[in-house]
Amino acid sequence: MENIMPFALLGLCVGLAAGTEGAVVKDFDISKFLGFWYEIAFASKMGTPGLAHKEEKMGAMVVELKENLLALTTTYYSEDHCVLEKVTATEGDGPAKFQVTRLSGKKEVVVEATDYLTYAIIDITSLVAGAVHRTMKLYSRSLDDNGEALYNFRKITSDHGFSETDLYILKHDLTCVKVLQSAAESRP
C-alpha cells in the first residue's frame, strides 16, 4: 500500500492539471493542421519570479504525416543557440490530443484552439523534476497581423491559470526559423 501512494499522488497531480483544461478542438482535422507554423508566444511558470525574462528568438514547427504518425520538426532558441528537434507523436485519448515521446520523457500535447488558417494554441504537459509542468504555445501561419491570435492566447492562458507575467512574446528574430527552413530544403 505504501508503494502505491506516490503513484496515486502523481495521478492526482496529473488529474488536477488536466482538470484545468479548456475546450479542446472537438472536430480536429489533422489534414488542415499540417504544414508550417511560426511560434510567436508562449506561457510558462518555469521562470524565476521577479527576474526579467530575456528575449528569445522566434521558433517554428513543421507538422507532417509519415506512416500514420504525426512527424514534428521544431526549432527553438535555448540558452545561446537554436535547437532543431524531430519527434513523432501518436494519437492520445481524444480529438486533438497527442503523446510525444522523447529521451527526456513523455509529453501530452493538446490543440486547445485553432482556425487552421491563422493560429493554433497548443497546451503541453510534461513531468519536469518530478513535478507536472505546463507550457502553452501560440503558433501562427504568418508573421503579419497576429492581434486576434494574441488576444485569444491571452484569454485561453488566463483561463488555464497563467498570469500576464507568465506570457512571453518572442522576439521577431528569424535565426531559428531559418534553421528549420534550411533543414526542410535539404531533405531529399
Curated annotation (Swiss-Prot):
<dbReference type="GO" id="GO:0005576">
    <property type="term" value="C:extracellular region"/>
</dbReference>
<keyword id="KW-0964">Secreted</keyword>
<keyword id="KW-0813">Transport</keyword>
<dbReference type="InterPro" id="IPR002345">
    <property type="entry name" value="Lipocalin"/>
</dbReference>
<keyword id="KW-0732">Signal</keyword>
<dbReference type="InterPro" id="IPR012674">
    <property type="entry name" value="Calycin"/>
</dbReference>
<dbReference type="GO" id="GO:0036094">
    <property type="term" value="F:small molecule binding"/>
</dbReference>
<feature type="disulfide bond">
    <location>
        <begin position="82"/>
        <end position="176"/>
    </location>
</feature>
<keyword id="KW-1015">Disulfide bond</keyword>
<dbReference type="Pfam" id="PF00061">
    <property type="entry name" value="Lipocalin"/>
</dbReference>
<feature type="signal peptide">
    <location>
        <begin position="1"/>
        <end position="19"/>
    </location>
</feature>
<comment type="similarity">
    <text>Belongs to the calycin superfamily. Lipocalin family.</text>
</comment>
<dbReference type="InterPro" id="IPR000566">
    <property type="entry name" value="Lipocln_cytosolic_FA-bd_dom"/>
</dbReference>
<comment type="function">
    <text>Associates with spermatozoa in the epididymal fluid but does not bind tightly to them. Binds both all-trans and 9-cis retinoic acid. May act as a retinoid carrier protein which is required for epididymal function and/or sperm maturation.</text>
</comment>
<protein>
    <recommendedName>
        <fullName>Epididymal-specific lipocalin-5</fullName>
    </recommendedName>
</protein>
<dbReference type="InterPro" id="IPR022272">
    <property type="entry name" value="Lipocalin_CS"/>
</dbReference>
